[in-house]
């Protein structure tokens, strides 16, 4: 099962956190969800050169907080903060509420699955041999402390007539272990032979101390509520 599903989705509430944090009734849920999708698409497109890995959206009572995880914060902030103020006004109009934008710098982009996949895609678009690009990434990631990394490339590799998939792995990537901190991302490289799909899994170690609100605690609270209802 762990081999098939999205490694991030199956670990939500255990070792991974949600990208959107808000509560809504049934009438507003779809509106908020569509708004989040539009904002994320706009920011990823606008900040293509800023190495953005993740965008978290948190809705409060009458405003919203957006946290942008990036390896190049200077590009987003701009000179004297002019660019981020302009970005804030545009996003506020899109969401219809005041927005506060927070920038979080990624210290080690080589350990971020999205940035690694994006790096491979950029090299493939510059006509670098895919084996050289992947092996360079494998070496950099393991050298900076990753326990394991797995990369899959799929498409017309090196301009071959028939598309194929190739896998590369360094270390171990335990997809069945829920406490394992596995980062995952997919990306597409637009080459002259077509789109080459790239998938990256990075294992950073096991998280033994679960945070408050894990699935175990949720299940425990649910069982307690059922017992209380039976007693009543």
Swiss-Prot record:
It comes from the Bacteria. Pfam families: KH_2, Ribosomal_S3_C. Keywords: Ribonucleoprotein, Ribosomal protein, RNA-binding, rRNA-binding. One of its GO terms (molecular function) is mRNA binding. GO terms for cellular component: cytosolic small ribosomal subunit. One of its GO terms (biological process) is translation. SMART domains: KH. PROSITE patterns: KH_TYPE_2, RIBOSOMAL_S3. Residues 39-107 form the KH type-2 domain. HAMAP family: Ribosomal_uS3_B. PANTHER family: 30S/40S RIBOSOMAL PROTEIN S3, SMALL RIBOSOMAL SUBUNIT PROTEIN US3C. NCBIfam families: rpsC_bact (TIGR01009). Binds the lower part of the 30S subunit head. Binds mRNA in the 70S ribosome, positioning it for translation. Belongs to the universal ribosomal protein uS3 family. Part of the 30S ribosomal subunit. Forms a tight complex with proteins S10 and S14. This is Small ribosomal subunit protein uS3.
């Amino acid at each position: 099962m762990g081999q098939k599903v999205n490694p991030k989705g199956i670990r939500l509430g255990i070792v991974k956190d949600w990208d959107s944090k808000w509560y809504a009734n049934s009438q507003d849920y779809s509106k908020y969800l569509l708004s989040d999708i539009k904002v994320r698409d706009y920011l990823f497109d606008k900040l293509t050169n800023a190495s953005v890995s993740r965008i978290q959206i948190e809705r409060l009572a009458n405003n919203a907080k957006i946290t942008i995880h990036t390896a190049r914060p200077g590009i987003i902030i701009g000179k004297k903060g002019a660019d981020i103020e302009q970005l804030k006004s545009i996003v506020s109009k899109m969401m219809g509420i005041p927005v506060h934008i927070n920038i979080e710098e990624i210290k080690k982009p080589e350990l971020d699955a999205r940035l690694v996949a994006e790096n491979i895609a950029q090299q493939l678009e510059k006509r670098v041999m895919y084996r050289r690009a992947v092996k360079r990434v494998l070496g950099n990631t393991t050298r900076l402390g990753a326990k394991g990394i797995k990369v899959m490339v799929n498409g017309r590799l090196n301009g071959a007539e028939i598309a194929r998939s190739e896998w590369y792995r360094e270390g171990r990537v335990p997809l069945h272990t829920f406490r394992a901190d596995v980062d995952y991302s997919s990306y597409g490289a637009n080459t002259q032979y077509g789109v080459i799909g790239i998938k990256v899994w990075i294992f950073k170690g096991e998280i033994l101390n679960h945070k408050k609100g894990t699935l175990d605690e949720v299940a425990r609270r649910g069982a307690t509520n059922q017992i209380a209802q039976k007693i009543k």
